[in-house]
A protein has these predicted regions:
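Active-site-proximal beta-alpha core segment in soluble small-molecule metabolic enzymes
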Residues: 2, 6-10, 14-17, 29-120
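Conserved PLP-enzyme active-site core in the AAT-like
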Residues: 25
């Protein structure tokens, strides 16, 4: 059996260049970065720092736990949780200024009834 070992190297300067280029093309829109699952295994905090340095302020993660990890590092970024209202403690979104993505009508209705506890949400 053949053993296939792969190595992925990411140049953070190139990542920054690509973000600036894409952000420039979207001049009237918000350009965001999806850094879920440890930035796809690249190291979420390293990738976050690199993109934040070039003015990326909107980040998508999969889980509330990932959002909290980033929030500890930087208080001014907009952090969106793709898994929606997964947390049993919905006040965590408001307390840490994390924005859940609402994935279905059930979550939308829940937020309408509990917006004071949640803060903001993205549909």
């Amino acid at each position: 059996m053949t053993n296939h070992n792969s190595i992925l190297e990411v140049n953070l300067k190139n990542l920054q260049y690509n973000y600036k280029k894409l952000s420039g093309l979207a001049n009237r829109s918000i350009c965001a970065a999806t850094i879920k699952s440890d930035a796809y295994g690249l190291g979420v905090l390293d990738v976050f720092d690199a993109l934040y340095k070039v003015s990326c302020r909107h980040f998508f993660v999969a889980t509330t736990q990932e959002a909290l990890e980033i929030r500890k590092k930087r208080s001014t970024a907009n952090i969106y949780v793709l898994n929606g209202l997964e947390s049993n403690n919905i006040s965590i979104f408001n307390k840490h200024e994390i924005i859940p993505i609402l994935n279905d009508i059930k979550e939308c209705n829940f937020v309408l009834k509990n917006i004071a506890k949640i803060g903001r949400a993205h549909v």
